[in-house]
A protein has these predicted regions:
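OB-fold (S1/OB) nucleic-acid-binding surfaces
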Residues: 60-85
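Short, conserved beta-turn/loop elements at beta-strand boundaries and strand-helix junctions
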Residues: 58-63, 112, 132
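Extended, charge-rich, solvent-exposed interface segments
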Residues: 90-100, 113-151
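A general secondary-structure signal for short beta-strands and their flanking turns/coil
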Residues: 46-48, 63-65, 100, 117
Length: 151
């Protein structure tokens, strides 16, 4: 395999409002390992995202599954961590909101069975506590990335 095939997808910096408004997703192939993408309203094809914000809530969905809400200046990212994300699940179990966190994760959309609404979430690859300066720098870089996408 070539290096390109083994490299990770870029983790895009985007605000929650853009991600929350995404309603289209697709798979790049029929193989179960084919990358899945969320298409944002700006037309960006996102497999992975990077966000920094305030972890405002952590909930136990089941014994093995935690849901975290990460707020940025425009909205909220939702992340779920369970048995396949043990480090992130442990982080969420021990976290004491509110606190600033950085999240790198896989972008996903899903549609509840009883709804026509398309919801978004990020499956965490990395979840880390950060300081205010890191959050502020991320907000500036996310704004610059957004301007590049719409410019």
């Amino acid at each position: 395999m070539s290096t390109t095939q083994n490299s990770r997808e870029v983790a895009y910096r985007l605000f929650a409002a853009e991600f929350e408004d995404a309603t289209l997703s697709y798979s790049a192939g029929d193989d179960e390992r084919a990358p899945n993408y969320v298409v944002t309203p700006t037309g960006e094809r996102i497999n992975r995202l990077f966000t920094v914000g305030a972890l405002t809530a952590v909930e136990s969905v089941t014994d093995d599954l935690r849901r975290g809400r990460i707020a940025d200046p425009t909205g909220v990212f939702v992340t779920y961590a369970g048995q396949y994300q043990p480090t992130a699940a442990s982080f969420l179990e021990q976290a004491t909101p509110p606190m600033f966190v950085a999240l790198t994760g896989k972008a996903r959309t899903y549609q509840p069975e009883d709804s026509d609404q398309v919801l978004t979430s990020a499956r965490p690859e990395d979840l880390t506590a950060v300081d205010t300066d890191t959050r502020d720098r991320w907000a500036v870089s996310a704004a610059q990335a957004t301007l590049r996408r719409i410019g």
